[in-house]
Amino acid sequence: MSKFSFNIHHQHKKARNGVITTAHGEIRTPAFMPVGTRGTVKAMLPESVAETGADILLGNTYHLMLQPTAERIARLGGLHKFMNWDKPILTDSGGFQVMSLSKLRKITEEGVSFSSHINGDKYMLTPERSTEIQHLLGSTITMAFDECTPYPATFEEAKTSMQLTTRWANRSRNAFVKRDGYAQFGIIQGSVYEELREQSARDLVELDFEGYAIGGLAVGEGQELMFKVLDYAPDFLPQNKPCYLMGVGKPADIIGAVRRGIDMFDCVIPTRSGRNGQAFTKYGTVNIRNSKYADDNEPLEHDCLCPACKNYSKAYLHLLVRIGEILGAMLMTWHNLTYFQNLMSRIRKYIKLGKDFDFDS
């Protein structure tokens, strides 16, 4: 079994192109991870997701612990077998969903107690339990349990939250079962305060995680402020380990973040937008519901090799989406995921060539 490793093959200014080696295969970086929240990327077969060029996808601890439960997935052979995906899987810690979806949640030093958004049952999620769940799922990359600092937050609020995340990171690291080819990433917090981001990074680097994530961004602060944080935050982290920007997926944000040293991304934007009838193209976004496409016999993009573009017109996609046919959601999602993987491929090529990303997203 391969050991977990990150090799940077090319670098252009702060942008890096490399390969992460794991027990479940290699991840070309910079990488975009489609989100498979409940063990599936919505409207896609797992093999179709692989055909778009994805090397890794993301699963969600919170949702899988509620249904069908981590213990059941473990009994059935683990998440890879359960969902028929043999490439790497990264699971988030569940912390963000607990904070955003659950009512009557209570944060203490021990963890977060909350009621299920499905049936109201009460649960307790701690750093140890989150890490155990991800181990039961068989996650290739496990995330440390953290508190995603809300925005806006005062300096003192952000400091208190960051310090809790640091203590939880210690407990997550102690609970992690180290195995060849598997990894655990720590998450730095600190909101928009450079001093706090630096302290968070310093504390987590001491724990020697296999990789690091920057959390607490894309929560309402806007692109300008996010880029300001990214101008310094990746520099606080080890340059020989992957750097993951959580929950960021707009093409322009990805390009700007790669320029600042980010290696990994995840976001629901391509899948959610696809189901809602919005396609990403190199000419800009297309709202296929618009009546102007009812008689448009051209594909979304002429040089795109996805099934939606190779086989169907905008007029047909317009019809499917307008009448709510499942095929419409499937084809639009397939196209968007292909677009995002093509974007990452182009970025990797430009880094390899030592060129600035002067193409439109």
UniProtKB/Swiss-Prot annotation:
InterPro entries referenced in this protein's UniProt entry, alphabetically: ArchSynthase1/Queuine_TRR, TGT, TGT-like_sf, tRNA_ribo_trans-like
Sequence segments annotated as region (RNA binding): 247-253, 271-275
Cofactor note: Binds 1 zinc ion per subunit.
Cofactors, names only: Zn(2+)
Residues that bind substrate: 92-96, 146, 189, 216
Active site as annotated: 92 (proton acceptor), 266 (nucleophile)
Enzyme kind, highest EC tier: transferase
Gene Ontology molecular function: any one: tRNA-guanosine(34) queuine transglycosylase activity
Domain of life the protein comes from: Bacteria
GO biological process per UniProt: queuosine biosynthetic process; tRNA wobble guanine modification; tRNA-guanine transglycosylation
One GO CC term, this protein: cytoplasm
Classification via Pfam families: TGT
Pathway annotation from the record: tRNA modification; tRNA-queuosine biosynthesis
Binding site residues for Zn(2+): 304, 306, 309, 335
Catalyzed reactions per annotation: 7-aminomethyl-7-carbaguanine + guanosine(34) in tRNA = 7-aminomethyl-7-carbaguanosine(34) in tRNA + guanine
EC code: 2.4.2.29
Keywords on record: Glycosyltransferase, Metal-binding, Queuosine biosynthesis, Transferase, tRNA processing, Zinc
Residue stretches spanning the membrane: none
Protein family (similarity comment): Belongs to the queuine tRNA-ribosyltransferase family.
Record's function text: Catalyzes the base-exchange of a guanine (G) residue with the queuine precursor 7-aminomethyl-7-deazaguanine (PreQ1) at position 34 (anticodon wobble position) in tRNAs with GU(N) anticodons (tRNA-Asp, -Asn, -His and -Tyr). Catalysis occurs through a double-displacement mechanism. The nucleophile active site attacks the C1' of nucleotide 34 to detach the guanine base from the RNA, forming a covalent enzyme-RNA intermediate. The proton acceptor active site deprotonates the incoming PreQ1, allowing a nucleophilic attack on the C1' of the ribose to form the product.
Subunit structure: Homodimer. Within each dimer, one monomer is responsible for RNA recognition and catalysis, while the other monomer binds to the replacement base PreQ1.
Record protein name field: Queuine tRNA-ribosyltransferase
